[in-house]
Amino acid sequence: MSRSTALCGAVALPCALLALPDNVLAQTANRALPPVTVDAPRTAEIRRPAKRTASRQTAARRPTQSTSTPAATTPQPQATAAAALSSIHQSPTGQPQTTVGRERFDNRPAFSVGDILRESPGISVKQGNGPRDLGISIRGSNARNGFGIRNMVIFEDGFPVTQPDGLSRSDLIDPHAYGAVDVIRGPSSALFGNYATGGAINFRTRPASEINGIEYGIDGGSFGYLNNYLTAGKKIGNFEASLFASDVRGDGYISNGWFNTQTVNFLSTLHVTPDDRFTVKFINNNLETRLPIRLSLNQFHQNPFQEGCVTGATAALGCGRVTLNNNGFNTTAGTDSETAEQAGLGRKDRRTIVGARWEHDFSNQSTWRNQFVFDDRNISQPTGSTSAIGDFPSYNYMSDFVGRGEMLGMSATTYLGAFYNTMSWSSDTVQVKPGGNATLGRLSSNVRGEHTNFGLRAREELQINNAWTAVAGVGLEQTQLKGLNTAYTYTGPTGITTTRLTSAERDFQNIAPELALLYRPNGEWLFRSRVGTGYGTPQVGNLFVVSSGQNGNNTQLEAQTNVGYDVGFDWTPNNTTKLSVTGFYEFFRNELVTQATPVGAPNSSFTFNAPRSEHRGVEAALDWRFHPGWRFTVAYTYLDQIYTNYAEDIANGAVFRFDRAGNKIPGISPNELTARLGYDEMFGPLKGLGGFVEVQWKDSFYMDNANLLKAPGYELVNLNVHYKTDLASDYLKSLSVFFEVRNVFDKTYVASANNIGNTVTAAGLQNGAGILANTTGSIYAGSPRTFTAGLKLAFR
């Protein structure tokens, strides 16, 4: 294909908190901040119970998008318990948190979730298996996984879009649909349960009252990219509804990378009575895409965009290949080495989510909420020598209560909740054979599984006085895994079938407490300290894959747990400046680490436990409006993650053991930064005209447990110019246009590098970087220079 186209928290937690055992801790919360602000905002004084008023209806609504102004010196109190309940998924008190408002991505080509989340410190993203499939990490939580999103919990308008097994996919996220995104950082299982070891993210669609009409937009640019999208919203009396729909297509910048995806996102709320609200949520995403093969580091340097890779026989240097059995079940009829385009590798998936929520106000000071979500993920994914095929329906129910009042003479907010979620499925792994369009051969394996989580959580927020606020919470959860793996082997030219059964039935019990203390001496400073815990159980599929990528017994996997300590501050000297800094230190036990398996293996990744590891780092964010119209923002993350107890066994005839204690955990970039300098004309005939220059920096990182091979880092520069104006028309409200150049200097860089396994010689010596650089199945290149323009019309 052508390339045309904390640190000073004056509030140390009591020593007793620091002595809590590693395997018994969790996390807590904060409060919603404006656009690109970070960490715990100020706590609001809780009002004494008052006579009920009709204001409950509006206060209970989800907050609108964050504005572009810095944090106010005095927070607005939450008028009702319903508002406090809504804030649980947006800004839980005491927890490092960032809200990215729509004004940060409304005037640029927001193609994927990465275009939003890079504005938050602590966040890193890498390309997954599809155009909008990104691996999102909070403090490096997901950097060791090869696809999808794990080790955090994701919500949309408060509805969970993470399935019970902990998997989330960003394919269904079109940034144009959202008004704000809340990033909650640090171990959070006390509040969000299983898999919230890194934190949580809540996407908020635009309120219907803000849309108040119809908007149509179109983005287009390099490599055949075209996004047509429509937004509609209206509030009439006690009812409001919003609808978003988009059709996105493109050729992709890597050979065999074309895509075609449609998304529908609907939200409606009906105030049946002054005390009762019913909300309905619907999301549907259809994805059809081709997928290139992940490369070795050497192949990346030779041919990053897979040019000249039509067939294996005529492939250019550096083309990725996959070996397919000619008969579709074994090697007796020979094999064929094919490129991704020749084999027809790709994905054809559907995701459907339906949710319903009922909220009832007993008074202004107490609200009860019940919520149910049906989430169905249907996949057909020939991504290599095999294709994963299956349907994964899940059910999620939660019921919670918030009450506001007094405790020991102090204003208090009490939160209690119970939850149950489950998923039951049968999925096949089928061999791909020559013939194009991912022709299927015989069944390689089948997994039948059940994954169930249920538990309780409680939380108390106490405003000790005007300066001090304390938070305590705990979550208790039971997780049940049941699975049966049937692996098929075929011998001889006729394929005589033998089967091997591996079963697993595991129960996990987890307790996750959290404690936080906030101190605000005056309107400029807020100091925070917190100890939180997280846990994440293995997935059923992890239990049946061994290090070679073959089907086998890996049922000894344990749940990972982490204990995290945060200390930080927010400094807001005036309305134009906000600086937030958080330092953290997290201790992991049995961390679940994933690495890529060789290309051609039935399974693309293998998961193991690292007995002990430590994660530490610093998150910083600056939002500085140094002159009218000008704005400078920075989001920076420093990460240092090491194994402290892990011995790796590597086989080559005999088995050799290597001590990895002290080594860096692979996949973790130590430094990441996004900085933007922008100007928007606020007055005069050019009002609405603006632009910005943006710099993204990602440091190099290790790809293997022995720390022998590094993926190179990169620096990218993006330029944007945009214009928005109101229209004097009976039918049109406004016109918005933009033009953006990304990767201005056309850097070739690594957008994704999955961890690779180390190898040894027959004598037990580890192979060096020169050998490891030939290990395939790891790297996707990032996009070269692109040009994108967009136009949006808002109708009355």
Where are these regions (language model features)?
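Short acidic/polar hinge/loop motifs at secondary-structure boundaries
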Residues: 159-185, 308
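Structural signature of Gram-negative outer-membrane beta-barrels, strongest in the C-terminal barrel
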Residues: 410-422, 448-587
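Transmembrane beta-barrel wall of Gram-negative outer-membrane proteins
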Residues: 220-249, 254-303, 309-313, 346-361, ...
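Extracytoplasmic beta-strand/coil segments of soluble accessory domains associated
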Residues: 75-98, 114-159
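Gram-negative outer-membrane beta-barrel transporters
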Residues: 401, 478, 578-580, 584-588, ...
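N-terminal periplasmic accessory domains that precede
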Residues: 113-116, 135-139, 152-156, 169-171, ...
